[in-house]
Structures are given as C-alpha cells and as structure tokens.
Amino acid sequence: MTVNLTTANEFIARHIGPRQEDEQHMLASLGFDSLEALSASVIPESIKGTSVLGLEDGLSEAEALAKIKAIAGQNQLFKTYIGQGYYNCHTPSPILRNLLENPAWYTAYTPYQPEISQGRLEALLNFQTLISDLTGLPIANASLLDEATAAAEAMTFCKRLSKNKGSNAFFASIHSHPQTLDVLRTRAEPLGIDVVVGDERELTDVSAFFGALLQYPASNGDVFDYRALTERFHASNALVAVAADLLALTLLTPPGEFGADVAIGSAQRFGVPLGFGGPHAAYFSTKDAFKRDMPGRLVGVSVDRFGKPALRLAMQTREQHIRREKATSNICTAQVLLANIASMYAVYHGPKGLTQIAQRIHQLTAILAKGLTALGQKVEQEHFFDTLTLNTGANTATLHDKARAQRINLRVVDAERLGVSVDETTTQADIETLWAIFADGKALPDFAANVDSTLPAALLRQSPILSHPVFNRYHSETELMRYLRKLADKDLALDRTMIPLGSCTMKLNAASEMIPVTWAEFGALHPFAPAEQSAGYLQLTSDLEAMLCAATGYDAISLQPNAGSQGEYAGLLAIRAYHQSRGEERRDICLIPSSAHGTNPATANMAGMRVVVTACDARGNVDIEDLRAKAIEHRDHLAALMITYPSTHGVFEEGIREICGIIHDNGGQVYIDGANMNAMVGLCAPGKFGGDVSHLNLHKTFCIPHGGGGPGVGPIGVKSHLTPFLPGHAAMERKEGAVCAAPFGSASILPITWMYISMMGGAGLKRASQLAILNANYISRRLEEHYPVLYTGSNGLVAHECILDLRPLKDSSGISVDDVAKRLIDFGFHAPTMSFPVAGTLMIEPTESESKEELDRFCDAMIAIREEIRAVENGTLDKDDNPLKNAPHTAAELVGEWSHPYSREQAVYPVASLIEGKYWPPVGRVDNVFGDRNLVCACPSIESYA
C-alpha cells in the first residue's frame, strides 16, 4: 500500500470550495476539460506567461503555525513607556473571544445593506455616541484609519470650510505627535498647503492661518488651556482641530466645550492591542453645521417600512464612489472591527469604569512625578495626564541604556530629554522600578497612594459622559457575552452564507490564518520600539514583501498603506515624485476610464493631479482610440493612467499591453489598480505587462477579513525606477513621505496574509485564481438565460466576476435592482454589488472559496426571483404588493396580521432548503430618505424603540 507521507499543499483543498468532481462538472458545463484550458481561453494572449510565482509548496496548517510562532518569538516584549499616541491596554477577554476572534464579526462586509447589518451598525452607533460624548461635539463618524490620517482629513476639512479663503497656511502645534506632523506634511504638499509647525504659546498673530491643529494633552505630556487661543483663531476666521486623548477626556474639559470645530484622535487605548502600529480606529467629530463635509462613514437612525427604528449608513452621497473627483476624501473604508472593540470596551466598563481607569493612570503618573522630583530629577510638566518629559541632560543616554538593560523602553525625546507614558497596564511595582532607574543609588521614595491631581482645576470635566443605558447595563461578563451574541445574530456574515459582492472578494478567512493575530508577540509591540526588539516583524515584512513581489512582478513593495485608498494615494505620490525628480513637475494630468471606481479620481485629486476621463466602448473596455487621442493631446502634461485590471466590468481587456504602451510613449506612468488581483495571481503579473505601480488589497485577494468595514491593508508594488519614492517614515531609512502613522501600517494583521501565502504555495495561489474564474463563469452561464450578462470577453467568458443587467426588468415589471437585493435576504443571501459600475445592475463575485452547492443555492435563488418577476410581468403577482417590493420579510410580520395577496410561505420560505436553516432579518426595508432628512447619529432614547 502506498501512503502519502507529505503534508505539502494540503491546505489548498481546505481553502478552495469545489470538490474535484464538482470542478469537472462545472468545467464541462462551460465546454472545457481542465482549468488550464479555461485559463488559456480567458487570459489574453498578450499577457500569458507573465507570472512565474517561484514560491515553494504550501505548508500544512500546523507547519505554518509553527514557523510563524518562531518568527513571532524573535520579537522582544519590553515594558514600554514610549507613548506618542500608542499605549498598552487590556483587551477584556469576553471582547477578545466573542468579538475579535468571532467570524460573525470579523468576516462581515461594510453595512451597505442595513437590513442584514443591524448588529454591527448598533455597535458603531455606540462608538459614535462614545466619541460625541467624550469630545463634546454632536456628530462623530464611524472611525477613520489612524490618528495621523484623521489629522490630515481635519486639515483639508478646515481648508474647505474656513472663511479665511485667501489663506493656504495651516498651523500645527509642535506639541503634536511627530508621526502626525509627518503625515500632515505629506498630505499638504500636493495640495499647495503650507504646514507651519510652531509653539502655540508663542503665537502672536494667527490671521495668516485657515486652520490649526492642537494636541490635548500635548505629546510631551503638557495639558494646555486652549480656550483663549481657540477664540483668537475663530476671530481670524480660522477653524480649530484638536487631537485629543479619549481616555483623558473622561477627566478633562472636552474640546467641543472650549470651542473646537473638530476633534480627532485614536481609540486604540480602548482595548485594542498596540500591534506594532495598527490597525486601530481613529475618530473624527465635529459641529452639526459641518456634518455634510465630514469624511468617512456615518451611521444614522432611520425607520423601516413598519415605522420601527432601524440603523443605516447615512448621507452616502458624500462618499467617494459617488462624488468621484469632487469627493471630500478618497477614504472608502473605516476601521469597523477596531471601532467595535473600542465601542464594547466602553460598554463593558461604562462611565464609572472608564473614569476609574483614567484616574488610576493619572494618579500613578502623579506618584511617579513626585517620586522622581524627590530623587532630584527635573520633570518639565506642571500639568499632565499620563505623560512626563524628564530633563535628563548629559545623563540621557546612560539612563536610556540602563532602562533598556532592564527590558524597559523610554521615549527618547531628544539628546537631553526622556519621556515616560503610563498606561492601563502599569502597576505600583512598575513605578518603583522606574524610580530605581533614576535613583542612582539613592533610597527610593515611599509609595504614597494619595497624591494631588496635577490637572488644571479650570480644565476639569464638569459634563457627564455616557449616560445612555447601553453604557450602563452590560457590566457583567454574562451580560456582555449575550449582548454581543444578540448583535451578531442580527447580521449576515461569511459564517452563515456566501457574500457575492463584486469587486470585494469575500473569500475564506481561514481560522489558522487568524490565530497569530491575537498572539502577544505580535500584539504587544510598540511601533517605535527599537529595531532589535522587532526582529520578528522585520522578518515577517521582509518575507511578505518578497512573496508579493513574486505575485505581482514588481521590484519592491511598501506595506505601509493601511487601506486600498491609501495605497492608491501612495502610488500616485510615487509617480508625482518620480516626475519631479526628472524636472517634469508640469506632469499633472491623470487619465482615468469612465468605468473606474470612484476612489481613483478622488485619489488623483488628493495627489494634486487633474483628472481627464477617457471613454469606454460598448463592451465595457477602454476605448483605446479615445485614450490614444487624449494621451497625445496631454502628452506634455501627462502624469499617469489609472486603470483597473481585470476591468471593473469583469473582463480581461485584450488591449492592456497596448494601453500601457500608449501611456509610456507619451511620458506617463501606468497605475494598475489591484482591486481585482484575485483573478491574476499565478496567471499574469501587472508588473510584467506594463504596470509601473499597483496597490493590492490584502483584505481581498490575500485573505485579511473585511471586519464589517475595515481594517484593510493596501500595500503598493513598484518597478525599480519608482522604488526611491515609496512611502517613508521617521522610523525608517527614508524619512519623508509617510502616508500613515506607523512605519508598517496595520502590521498586526500582516500575519494573516503571510499564513495564506505560506499555506497555499505557488500552486495553490494559481489554483485559487483559476477557481475564482471558474466559479464566476459557472454562475454567469447558469444565470444568462434568466438575466442578461452585461459584459464578457471576446470568447464569451468573464474574469472572476460578472454583471447581470436588471434594467430591462425594471422596464417590464417595475422591479428594481434594490427590490432584488432585498428579496435575496429572504433567501438568506447578502446581495451582490448594486449599481456599480453600471446603474441598475448586480455585480457578482463568488470567489474560489465557495462550493458548487453554495453556488447552486445562490443561482436557484436568483432563478426563483426571476420567476417572481415574471409573475409580476404577467399579472399573477400584484405590481405593488408582491414579495419583491415588500422584501425583506421579518418574523414579526409573519406572525402579525397578514394582508398581502401572496402567502406567508412564499414570503419567508420561497425555497424548501430554507426550512433547514432560516436567517430572519431584524428589520424591514429601511427608509433611506427618512434617515437623511431626520439625521440622528447617536444612540436614540430607549423610548424610541417602544
């Protein structure tokens, strides 16, 4: 008997949905006998053979976990007091187990379909209420990417809204976190904004500025009274943004109460691990008058068709996918998973618990300061919350080294000063250890538990916080566990059903890939810890850069961008800097096809480029002659082309090499958007067929989960001539050009992609692309008799997604794409992407992870819906009172008085398979218009649910 003794590549079958016999059946239905034959027919001849992965065989799950455990073990976990916007904290175990490690939470998509997203929408509304309460400003968004990005958004927000229209100068306090100032400078330069960094205490004339950023408390620890300064800025028609520590705001006067127009910051210390810099949820709050100019997503309270309260994403017409180059921001994701952790941290601790944590931290800091002063050490701050700057003079290096020898990290402010930041994990023993470092042999002070607060009396908070019942109920673990379960049960995520969203790649996020994320070796490392302490992360990132270079054909990778939008931005900045280095600053025209995702033109605008739109032909491809004409017309100013490949229409355009050649011949660079990379890995490589730069979505192609709307990771790959212009960071060799706060962005979720690639190997990655193409074509073929497939390649095939045209059905029956999307909920499915890239269509991307059984279940649902539409067309079903117009149907409606002309069974059990397991939407169809006309973006009163 021959026994296979190797475990190589065994994970591939776990990741890929269809079994071998199903694969053959699906291929046969398309007229092919192998995946290679299908691939050869789909991939254009001109780009075949451009991908040679060169990766080893896939490791087994056990082998990969053992290998990454060894890598993680190279990180050294010192006791860290660096601060600078990053603080160690405790992630409560019920939140860790029931939210962060729960696929019901981390595999969900952005809540664009509110009826199946009420759970995470409620958690996000809690987050917005938390931020609004603590900052004293009435409107808060559902999170941004990090504090530095939020500061950059605040700067451009102030520029748009300031009445000081003649000004291009923005004041930024020198007491801001250094990484924030770096990101501000990066964002400002292409927009022609002059960032003036200075000490606000020395400002005599503020009339030159359209806005200002102040840090509260300051990065060095000082707590300044900004009331008078804020009034001065307002008198000069400037707006004021305050970067505030959320935990400190439980004790300090909130920014909104001293006149701030915007508050921004990080919610990281609300239960989210350091993670070597991310991901963390930033926040952004502002005055009600400015709500329509606020960046990011906003959860609002509306009603469903029964008049019951229901939540939804509000004011979506602000978002970049709609406003394109006129958008106020290019950000198209939030940090939902992290915002929800912070939200539940506040729910679990409540107002008293949060205040006690803040008081304890402040008291320990005051005790530390008193003891250091007694030891003869000069403390610079009179008023502080949790951070001290110590004037250590000539002893700075000696004291720093002494601390390091005891596995303690202090912040090196400069050659003569050290910083110490106390956090939730600091103990009395830690304070005494710090005293010993500075004692130089002197007797240690007695630990006095009662030391007077050093916060200014005039700035002590008087207003209450978190009075809503949700923050005052779930304080036992039992209650919180059940609350999290109740919310999760309201939502549809990948743990229940396929999510066939086109352009979103909702594939499996395997359990083995997720396990390392919550290891302390990855989670407890400060992003500015010395390099020798982060050897594991440096190996991980080096490995990952090599893997992604192999997958894309590029020469270098930057892992810093912490979202696809930031990857786009970093890519265009690299192109811009390249042209500038050649003395061609005039090159500022960016060509973008009309079919492009709205992020593309929004990003080009942010990068200081002018957008020129090129046409698409009747088949959805780039009109090459129109592109050629516009490239020639703008050849002296052409900077770049942004193009998605395969196209947003779901096909491999055959002219891609010619398109790239046209741009290069006219002096431009080619940016290939990697949103659809899941169709290409192992089959063709953008860096080999004409791309100069691409961003990748690790949260799509490379298995990082969507988290209900973030986190994402958007690294960029570049050819060698663009390598010098990759994002830099103060903690890296290249200092300029940071696009986010941490040097490696959302570093703590990079192990997910490392695990995926290591377990799939070269053969598995190629097979995943082939199965993604097979699954999409199988759906396309099964449904084409019922719904027109809008675009195909010249051979009648699609890439990894297909677009169904529902516009004729609207004309014949009055049934809209929205009706079909909502009816799919009754069948237990998340809808495909609606009305993008073409209005009135559904774009379906099944991914390689879905089995034939699940694909058939979806196709059966779509066919059954088509039969219902046909019944409307022929009059069997009423044109207004039918299962589609009334979808989705709730359990409450089922047991209530039934007045519809169709049966209860048809409403909620339209196919027999649902009897085995039925998802019940918690609300009926949500009224979008009501929600925007009656905007409420904080927790409503309990009475409203009566």
From Swiss-Prot:
The modification N6-(pyridoxal phosphate)lysine is found at K700. Its cofactor is pyridoxal 5'-phosphate. InterPro entries: GcvP (IPR003437), GDC-P_C (IPR049316), GDC-P_N (IPR049315), GDC_P (IPR020581), PyrdxlP-dep_Trfase (IPR015424), PyrdxlP-dep_Trfase_major (IPR015421), PyrdxlP-dep_Trfase_small (IPR015422). It comes from the Bacteria. GO terms for biological process: glycine decarboxylation via glycine cleavage system. Its EC number is 1.4.4.2. The keyword Nucleotidyltransferase does not apply. GO terms for molecular function: glycine binding; glycine dehydrogenase (decarboxylating) activity; pyridoxal phosphate binding. GO terms for cellular component: cytosol; glycine cleavage complex. Keywords: Oxidoreductase, Pyridoxal phosphate. It catalyses: N(6)-[(R)-lipoyl]-L-lysyl-[glycine-cleavage complex H protein] + glycine + H(+) = N(6)-[(R)-S(8)-aminomethyldihydrolipoyl]-L-lysyl-[glycine-cleavage complex H protein] + CO2. The keyword Oxidoreductase applies. The glycine cleavage system is composed of four proteins: P, T, L and H. The glycine cleavage system catalyzes the degradation of glycine. The P protein binds the alpha-amino group of glycine through its pyridoxal phosphate cofactor; CO(2) is released and the remaining methylamine moiety is then transferred to the lipoamide cofactor of the H protein. Belongs to the GcvP family. This is Glycine dehydrogenase (decarboxylating).
